[in-house]
């Protein structure tokens, strides 16, 4: 019979003012083999985030995407880390994200078992097979420096490890079928997906960049690289310090995006800014550019689809972030990002603008206008055309003034 701990009460606006995160203790005896936690509340009226720490630290996060989770030595609900259940006091984290004026009642039940197999997560779907030969689009040949090539990718995607609908394998197969060379898997406030990435990447022939979208009510940031878990409860400057110290890169994600715009103060400046995101709904708007240039014109602009699920989102690679790399693999992509060898296009097969030495090269952009910080510079007449280089950000615009491609 599992050992059961129950907590119940009412979260109010006063609780949210006191702290965004609250902790409900669960005692885990030595020899425990399974933990299962369930949270009940009126989901039509409120949004409560769910996560967990053990005596040794972080064990998982699912935000508002799940009502329950389970952890066992050899398996865990996506978003959570399998492994030994350390004896001692565990803490279930409740994030108060959204409340009605009168608050919301909640009931939390935690079960702990010492019987192997009694409390286990639901089984995961069988992985899809790799794409058959010929179903993957051929690589796009863009002009690059000797020994390098431009890789097409997406720096912002989600899976079932947070609030996405696809497994890591399903996302990888889908992205490979779209012709992408790399994808950063950036699930919210968790790194439980990282352990899957190398094997899935090898199976589907795509580079999978470890990532975490550090997610708070004041803004989201993409921590890229094998940097471990970044504690979203700490100030944003600590995210930058931890990511850089561990060899990764931090991006301010969708800084102008409705209620998830960036409002967090920082002394430092992350090296990347997600200038192009699906929330750039009208590509004639210049607000994302204005924010980037006011925040830090030296930051490298990148793009991300923020992919979650088929049927409701633009597909991965919308926009496409191009990175000039000396090799395949996560380290090469990070090196290219760090060096600023980046360009963004609205889609993988769309117009691209590349900086090459003292030149700007427009590819597949006939009819577009090359525009610099001071205004229009030239009309593109040919499928591949070079122009004198110039300082500052450069864009390709269509005749309506919509951005087609962007580079620094």
Locations of regions flagged by a protein language model:
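Solvent-exposed, flexible loop/coil segments flanking beta-strands in beta-rich domains
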Residues: 1-40, 112-118, 124, 141-144
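Short beta-strand elements
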Residues: 110-111, 125-130, 401-408
């Amino acid at each position: 019979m599992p050992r059961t701990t129950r907590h119940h009460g009412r979260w109010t606006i006063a609780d949210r003012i006191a702290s965004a995160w609250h902790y409900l203790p669960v005692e885990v005896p030595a020899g425990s083999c399974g933990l299962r936690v369930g949270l009940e509340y009126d989901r039509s009226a409120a949004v409560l985030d769910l996560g967990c720490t053990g005596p040794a630290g972080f064990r998982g996060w699912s935000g508002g995407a799940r009502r329950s989770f389970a952890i066992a030595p050899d398996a865990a609900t996506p978003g959570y880390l399998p492994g030994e259940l350390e004896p001692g006091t565990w803490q279930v984290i409740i994030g108060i994200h959204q409340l009605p004026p009168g608050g919301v009642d909640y009931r939390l039940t935690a079960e702990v078992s010492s019987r192997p197999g009694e409390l286990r997560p639901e089984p995961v779907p069988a992985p899809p097979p790799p794409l058959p030969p010929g179903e993957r689009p051929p690589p796009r040949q863009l002009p690059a420096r000797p020994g390098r090539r431009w890789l097409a990718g997406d720096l912002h995607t989600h899976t079932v490890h947070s609030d996405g609908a696809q497994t890591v394998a399903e996302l990888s197969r889908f992205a490979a079928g779209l012709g992408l060379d790399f994808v950063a898997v950036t699930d919210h406030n968790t790194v439980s997906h990282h352990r899957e990435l190398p094997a899935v990447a090898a199976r589907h022939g795509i580079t999978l960049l470890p990532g975490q979208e550090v997610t708070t009510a004041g803004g989201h940031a993409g921590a890229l690289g094998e940097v471990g878990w970044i504690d979203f409860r700490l100030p944003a400057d600590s995210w930058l310090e931890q990511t850089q110290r561990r060899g990764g890169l931090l991006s301010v994600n969708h800084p102008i995006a409705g209620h998830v715009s960036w409002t967090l103060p920082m002394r430092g400046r992350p090296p990347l800014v997600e200038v192009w995101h699906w929330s750039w709904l009208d590509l004639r708007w210049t607000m994302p550019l204005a924010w980037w240039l006011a925040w830090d014109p030296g930051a490298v602009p990148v793009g991300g689809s923020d992919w979650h699920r088929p049927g409701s989102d633009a597909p991965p690679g919308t926009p496409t972030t191009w990175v000039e790399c000396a090799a395949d693999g996560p380290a090469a992509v990070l090196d290219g990002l760090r060096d600023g060898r980046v360009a963004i296009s609205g889609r993988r097969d769309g117009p691209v603008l590349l900086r090459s030495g003292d030149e700007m090269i427009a590819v597949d952009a006939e009819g577009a206008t090359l525009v610099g910080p001071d205004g229009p510079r030239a009309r593109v007449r040919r499928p591949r055309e070079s122009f004198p280089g110039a300082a500052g950000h450069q864009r390709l615009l269509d005749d309506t003034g919509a951005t087609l491609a962007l580079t620094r």
